[in-house]
């Protein structure tokens, strides 16, 4: 039976890969993103339904939810990324203790909005549409385990929130889990800041000696939404080739 799937941040990278995987199974897939042009191009190329929306803005999330229809089976909260890589200078450029605090506050709020609030808002907006047997899949990061940055903290908070969410929605027949990727090649996550030396270190840290691929994350999301994963909930699945282990 065809499912209805929503993938936030579906215009490129991992979101596009996840959307493509569900489409291959005959599902109806809605993709959202801030870049309306790129979203439309991706939708036309892969056969998805685009809804331009910034997942950090309540009014845009509410509008997006209204365009979905009444039913939903799978929610993949992919929207996010390390805003430290993409943001222009934020806050005042003045010197002094207050100016520094304002810059720190702006940087932290940006990553928390992009990586935590986006998932919370989207999930809240569509929760009543998710049918029994449905799945909520949030995408975290290995940075939640190692990065002493606002990005790592935001992804750690996402995992903690997901565990609590699982307890809340279990009685409705829903599951909620986190996929935590390690280094994934063929994406623009690092925005041109990944040096060859660091890339080599990231690959060397794995047990299987290779970078992750978008398909690794797409297949994991597809599995978590399958009938075979109905007793998996409240968990963080690490997809990193052994770069981080739970024991």
Please give the residue ranges for each predicted region:
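A glycine/serine/threonine-rich, flexible loop-to-helix segment
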Residues: 89-91, 171, 184-206, 246-247
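Catalytic Tyr-X3-Lys loop
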Residues: 92-120, 137, 158
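Active-site helix of classical SDR
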Residues: 123, 154
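Alpha-helical segment proximal to the catalytic Tyr-Lys
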Residues: 128, 167-168, 230
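Short, small/polar-rich loop/turn modules that mediate ligand/substrate recognition or access, typified
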Residues: 170, 175, 232-234
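A conserved structural motif in NAD(P)-dependent oxidoreductases
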Residues: 206-217
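Short C-terminal tail/terminal secondary-structure segment
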Residues: 233-247
